[in-house]
Amino acid sequence: MLKIMFNDACGLTNAVLKGNKIRTTRFEKMPDRYRHYLNVKQQGAIPYLINTYDEDTGLFTIKQCHPFKEQMEKFALFSPRYKKGETYAVAQPYKQLPENLKKMLNLKETDAGWNNKMFVKPAYMPWRIRILDVEIFPLYVYAGSEQLCLEEGIIKAPQPFPDNMRYSHISEVENVKYYHSYSNAIAGLFNEVCGRDTWKNHYNQWIVSYKFNVEQNIV
């Protein structure tokens, strides 16, 4: 089993475990041929192009569809990092695991994964996520969908904060950052997690978006 890591400084691991974050976005390397046809598809093409996900192979396929022919010509393939239906261990440093679990697994402060979750064993992790859906779309799609932003972990208050701010996310520098709109909030979150100006510099980039649910693992 493989593991998946979320940003701790911005509270994303905790958001996943609490069920407040049920979607994650990854900037993955796509073949040039695949990205080219994605852009052609976005602009509209006749014969038109279809981008589909095959659950059996775990591959995205772009096919050319001829309006007056039944057959479809396969143009390009892309294999996303995570596959629909599969489970992945949510990485946490050993020191954060429940005391009874640390004792049962005989974990010590000298273990490589005690402070660094990059070195933990997936089988020891008490939580899993199961991938429910895999999608490919440009990053800017988030700017037009409150639902997607909330699934990414953006928090919406029942009532506006002072200055009419209603959306927020945990920040590495500040405890919480507040925003007037969900689009500004998701832009701020991407900049926090992926680096300054990520939203502006990658606004038109195709990304892979994974929707998931969280499950407890019986170690």
Residue ranges and their predicted role:
Residues 1-219:
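Secondary-structure transition motif
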